[in-house]
Amino acid sequence: TPDLLPADITGSYFYDPEKNKFKFRKGPIFCNILLADEINRAPPKTQAALLEAMQEKQITIEGTTHKLAAPFIVLATQNPIEYEGTYPLPEAQMDRFLIKLSVGYPDEDVETGILEGRSQRKKDTFSVKPRATPDKVVEMHDSIEEVFVKKEVMKYIVDLVQSTRRDPRVAVGSSPRGSLGLFKLSRALAVLSGR
């Protein structure tokens, strides 16, 4: 929301009169998966609070660094920029998201399926069962690091990223984070494909 402050996400220090000192109260960023719903409704200063967390897996508040949980993943939804009350995401922040998907509207069959699925539930709530522990996700992430990538694949990744910097149809080409992201994605795909 437009009135969301950085401290609402990161947490803040508060004075404890009983102990006569300041204590840190963790914000919702201290989690494994942070869902930033409609991220571009948050003001730029609040969006900026995510930059260090997304890159360094830590946050610094009043000179004190706080490590975030492992794994730490940010998923975000975004409204079209032309919607009233939205702010553009800065390039530095967009650069930290590995993947961007444009969902769009479902076709007639898919939308009918959504309604059929909803009609089978009696309430608007449903339960979600965990599929993996945070430790298992870290283990899977670490297994990706063991995947060998041929030089030809690395060259293809670099060529692809470099082409985004030369193409006049691309407003802002990919940064080196794009190469690193494609490198990581190719390794993950190899693991998922059983290679």
Regions found by a protein language model. Give the residues of each.
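C-terminal helical "lid" subdomain and adjoining coupling/linker elements of P-loop NTPases
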Residues: F148, T164-R195
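AAA+/P-loop NTPase substrate/partner-engagement loops
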Residues: T1-E18
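Beta-to-alpha transition at the N-cap of a short helix in the ABC ATPase nucleotide-binding domain
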Residues: P6, T46-Q47
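Residue-level signature of catalytic and energy-coupling elements of molecular machines
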Residues: I9, L50, F97, I157, ...
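Amphipathic, well-packed alpha-helical segments that form the structural scaffold of globular domains
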Residues: V158-Q162
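Conserved alpha-helical scaffold flanking the Walker A/P-loop in AAA+ ATPase domains
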Residues: Y15-L35
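Walker B catalytic acidic pair
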Residues: D37-E38, A49
